[in-house]
A protein has these predicted regions:
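Catalytic cores of glycan-processing enzymes that make or break glycosidic bonds
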Residues: 2-282
Length: 283
């Protein structure tokens, strides 16, 4: 029997990526921060912008925000000849010289350029699917790489980033549409233009979500700085609330757990305020 009682529903979107940076070299080991930003985090903002009556709580992990900041700083320094881009995949997109064919570095970039959903991303674009098919051959028979040029890899890198591009960006960006129509033989100017789009999307994430919050459409919240499980820092026994039979250390709490938990929250607020220019409404 249907009930007349209305149940409030809160849609909470949790935007989280762990730290992918090698602390020794500051190099990014995986590209998921900037790829999910140009795809999912951007599209989510666009859907909310297009539907003024929609409401949502959006939570950002501080380590994600810090990595977006790092990408922006590195790209800006690279533009001015004052530094390198610390993500091998993004750096290769605009590299003047790509690795020599047949080398492990060349094959490594091929591998990275295939890390995408086959049906929803790769096969959606005939040009990308064709490049991916050739790439599979070169992966299985590396000795054949000597017969191809760096043009193959530069086109594959461009299509990898085009494939990951958010749908709303694809529909609105003349640059993205032009590159898709061109399809192959991408020039250095094409690759730099694509990097410009990526930079613009990354730099726009903070202002867009801040504006949505100011309009009252979004409540912005933040997680502990490193996404730490604060109850466990304070009381290891809290784990038994979800897993009664779990084996736990003899200690009742993590060393300096309360102080560490307080630092996690304070550092989270600091990063959030720096990125969005406002304090979080929830934590």
């Amino acid at each position: 029997m249907a009930s007349d009682t209305k149940t409030p529903v809160v849609l909470c979107w949790h935007m989280h990526q762990p730290s992918y940076q090698d602390m020794r070299t500051d190099q990014f080991l995986f590209p998921w921060v900037y790829l999910h930003t140009i795809k999912d985090y951007s599209d989510m903002a666009a859907h909310l912008e297009a539907n003024p009556d929609a409401r949502a709580v959006v939570n950002f992990a501080p380590v994600l925000l810090e990595q977006i900041e790092t990408y922006l700083i590195q790209i800006e320094k690279w533009r001015h000849g004052a530094g390198e881009i610390g993500d091998p995949l993004l750096a290769a997109l605009v590299a003047e010289q790509l690795p020599e064919t047949g080398t492990p570095a060349f094959l490594g970039l091929i591998e990275k350029s295939l890390r995408a959903n086959r049906e929803r991303i790769i096969n959606r674009y005939p040009a990308y699917a064709q490049l991916a098919e050739l790439a599979e051959v070169y992966r299985k028979k590396p000795e054949l790489q000597r017969y191809i040029s760096s043009r193959f890899l530069s086109d594959l890198l461009v299509w990898y980033h085009l494939g990951w591009m958010g749908e709303t960006i694809r529909r609105s960006s003349h640059c993205i549409q032009s590159l898709q129509e061109k399809g192959h033989n991408f020039s250095m100017d094409d690759r730099k233009a694509l990097l410009d789009v990526i930079f613009d999307v990354l730099s726009g994430i903070g202002p867009r979500y801040r504006h949505l919050a100011q309009k009252g459409q979004v409540e912005l919240s933040v997680s502990p700085y490193t996404h730490a499980m604060l109850p466990l820092l304070i009381d290891l026994g809290a784990a038994r609330e979800a897993m009664p039979d779990i084996a736990l250390p003899a200690h009742s709490h993590y060393p300096e757990g309360e102080a560490r938990a307080a630092w996690q929250l304070q550092q989270a607020r600091t990063v959030f305020q720096r990125f969005f220019g406002v304090d979080p409404s929830g934590c």
